[in-house]
């Protein structure tokens, strides 16, 4: 698999490419399946439909890897929290975790068992996916998941989580430990079901200053990575802590690939981390609105990475109103243009 070879820094005939949120609303085929499922959460829980939308970007765009269709918040949902997706508001947990009593009611074992629909999605997808295409599993990072559990949903200020961090750090650590323990087993079950690589998304890493993030954020990512690599050394692990360009020199661990977000200069990331890790990313997602902008972005990134120790991706998820034709153009452009650098 070209994607797996690239994750381990091996030579490839061209730079492999996939996109975060590639199974998503920009595809009419995805919207048809989502409408048939009824709502987003129902789609996540219907393994046949979830597998169908997982495969769509491979069939329609020609990406080099599929990423299983799910959501990072199914873990706290199946631990025992009540989750709703409200139109215009996003995910909402009706009873946030603000006391030890509420945390004690959440079950790691229950979550790992109840997430069987995710494992079924993986098994079915791996059966249908071409043997030369990788299937990526994923989870949210403990910090990002914990913010939703504490805040009760999306937030711009993280004031409840941050108050807890400084006022009651022991309790925040207790939440993070429990979430991390669930994620260890969750990723392990994904691997047993057939994923070829895993990615850990820390979407809200930038909410914390350096020292706080290293203690409450990245240390738990590394605990998760250490567990997976100790059990499954041949499974590549990708980390994606968004928005921490100010302290990349403080980042290290046993992961294989570091995901670079679009706000981080790729040349700086290469100079800081490129000798230790394969880099993934990092084209600005809005470039996909224009084929000229796609050309410029692809050329710039390829000139920096030169076809080595690199997986092409966007620097965040593809946006819902990107024309499918432009997404196809992006994928084909990377695959064709990168070949000359990989000789």
Swiss-Prot record:
Compartments where located: Cytoplasm
GO biological process per UniProt: protoporphyrinogen IX biosynthetic process from glutamate
Keyword Lyase: yes
Keywords, ordered alphabetically: Cytoplasm, Decarboxylase, Lyase, Porphyrin biosynthesis
InterPro entries to which the protein is assigned, alphabetical: UROD/MetE-like_sf, Uroporphyrinogen_deCO2ase_HemE, Uroporphyrinogen_deCOase
GO CC field: cytosol
Known pathway: Porphyrin-containing compound metabolism; protoporphyrin-IX biosynthesis; coproporphyrinogen-III from 5-aminolevulinate: step 4/4
Subunit details: Homodimer.
Family per similarity comment: Belongs to the uroporphyrinogen decarboxylase family.
Protein name (record): Uroporphyrinogen decarboxylase
Organism of derivation: Campylobacter fetus subsp. fetus (strain 82-40)
Gene behind the chain: hemE
């Amino acid at each position: 698999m070209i994607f797996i070879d690239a994750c381990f820094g091996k030579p490839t005939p061209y730079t492999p490419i996939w996109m975060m949120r590639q199974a998503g609303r920009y595809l009419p085929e995805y919207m048809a399946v989502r409408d048939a499922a009824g709502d987003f959460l129902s789609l996540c829980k219907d393994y046949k439909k979830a597998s169908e939308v997982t495969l769509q970007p491979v069939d329609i765009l020609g990406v080099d890897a599929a990423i299983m269709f799910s959501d990072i918040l199914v873990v706290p949902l199946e631990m025992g929290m009540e989750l709703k997706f409200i139109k215009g508001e996003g995910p909402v947990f009706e009873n946030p975790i603000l006391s030890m009593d509420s945390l004690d009611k959440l079950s790691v074992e229950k979550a790992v068992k109840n997430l069987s629909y995710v494992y079924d999605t993986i098994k079915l997808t791996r059966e249908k996916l071409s043997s030369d295409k990788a299937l990526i599993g994923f989870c949210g990072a403990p910090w990002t998941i914990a913010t939703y559990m504490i805040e009760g949903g999306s937030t711009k200020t993280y004031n409840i989580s941050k108050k807890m961090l400084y006022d009651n750090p022991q309790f925040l650590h207790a939440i993070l430990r429990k979430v991390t323990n669930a994620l260890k087993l969750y990723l392990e079950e994904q691997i047993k079901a057939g994923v070829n690589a895993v990615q850990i998304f820390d979407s809200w890493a930038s909410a914390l200053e350096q020292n706080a993030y290293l203690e409450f954020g990245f240390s738990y990512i590394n605990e998760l990575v250490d567990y997976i690599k100790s059990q499954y050394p041949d499974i590549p692990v990708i980390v994606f802590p968004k928005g921490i360009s100010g302290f990349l020199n403080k980042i290290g661990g046993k992961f294989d690939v570091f995901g670079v977000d679009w706000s981080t200069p790729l040349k700086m990331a290469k100079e800081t981390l490129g000798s230790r890790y394969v880099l993934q990313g990092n084209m600005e997602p809005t470039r996909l609105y224009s084929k000229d902008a796609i050309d410029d972005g692809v050329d710039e990134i390829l000139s920096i990475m030169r076809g080595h120790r690199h997986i092409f991706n966007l620097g965040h998820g593809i946006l819902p109103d990107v024309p499918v034709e432009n997404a196809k153009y992006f994928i084909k452009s990377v695959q064709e243009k990168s070949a000359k650098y990989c000789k």
